[in-house]
């Protein structure tokens, strides 16, 4: 049996507690689950050919949530690289690199969002981990999980408000690796950022009205690698278009922590 985070042969990861991220999508929730520890879920080319291998670019990563939200990069020099460190696997982003879903993800049926990531930033520049739409600041019904220049992680969300409602977690000076959680609801307005299993900040400022939108999801950069490029790593990324219970949050954070090599 492969341990958590060493899922080389495509077996669905299940934590030692029995938690499986697929359970987050059991009721038809929209979203995505990207798992760099599952080498069978990745390919070198954006058309889904050429098996992924360590130290080579990744141009295609399957969505394991069952929503078919495959993320790709058609331009060869904009692809992240699959890396291994001991039992851990991750996508390394350097410079103008990023992935984007081949199709949009239709979150128009929900105004709640749960975002979980295992990420590392190597610099204290502004950089995206995940962003719904090509520019969340200019698109209603979007969110953004990112690093902000300085020592901050940020989760931001909006409905039809004039701008994003931001929550920041401070004192995370690069290089640093963390489990990041963003939770938000538009109609019952809250935006929460958690780091390593602990809530760090929240806001109940109005995000306007409406639901999340039908947009592409960007990973590791804005607009298909066009800006806010991450200099760092992504070990795990789970996007769920629904609110999550305390048990679901705790289980998912523990799962992501094991994938990332972080102790909660």
Task: Name every feature range the model reports, one short phrase each.
Residues 29-31, 57, 61, 88, ...:
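Extracellular structured ligand-interaction cores
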Residues 18-25, 92-113, 163-172, 223-225:
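Short surface loop/edge beta-strand patches of beta-sandwich-type extracellular domains
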Residues 158, 212-239, 244:
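Extracellular glycan-interaction patches encoded by glycine-rich segments
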Residues 24-29, 83-85, 108-110, 147-148, ...:
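Extracellular/periplasmic catalytic domains that process cell-envelope and extracellular macromolecules
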Residues 38, 119-121, 183-186, 223, ...:
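Short beta-strand segments enriched in hydrophobic/aromatic residues
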Residues 62-97, 116-126, 134, 139-207:
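Extracellular glycan-interaction surfaces
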Residues 2-70, 116, 233, 244, ...:
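GGW-centered surface loops in extracellular recognition modules
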């Amino acid at each position: 049996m492969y341990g958590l985070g060493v899922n080389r042969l495509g077996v669905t990861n299940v934590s030692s507690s029995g938690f499986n991220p697929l359970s987050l999508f059991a009721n038809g929730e929209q979203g995505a689950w990207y798992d760099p520890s599952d080498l069978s879920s990745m390919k070198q080319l954006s058309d889904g050919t050429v098996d992924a291998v360590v130290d080579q670019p990744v141009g295609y990563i399957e969505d394991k949530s069952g929503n078919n939200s495959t993320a790709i990069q058609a331009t060869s020099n904009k692809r992240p690289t699959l890396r291994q460190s001991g039992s851990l696997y991750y996508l390394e982003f350097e410079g103008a690199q990023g992935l984007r879903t081949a199709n949009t993800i239709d979150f128009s049926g929900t105004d709640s969002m749960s975002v979980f990531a295992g990420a590392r930033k190597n610099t204290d520049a502004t950089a995206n981990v995940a962003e719904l739409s090509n520019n969340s600041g200019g698109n209603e019904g979007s969110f953004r999980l990112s690093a902000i220049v300085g020592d901050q992680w940020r989760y931001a969300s909006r409905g039809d408000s004039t701008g994003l409602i931001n929550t920041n977690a401070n004192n995370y000076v690069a290089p640093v690796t963390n489990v990041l959680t963003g939770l938000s609801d538009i109609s019952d307005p809250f935006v929460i950022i958690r780091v390593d299993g602990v809530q760090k900040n929240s806001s109940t400022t109005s995000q306007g009205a409406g639901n999340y939108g039908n947009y592409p999801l960007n990973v590791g950069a804005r607009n298909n690698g066009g800006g806010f490029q991450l200099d760092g790593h992504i070990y795990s990324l789970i996007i769920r278009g629904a609110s999550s219970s305390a048990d679901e949050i705790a289980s998912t954070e523990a799962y992501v922590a094991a994938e990332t090599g972080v102790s909660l």
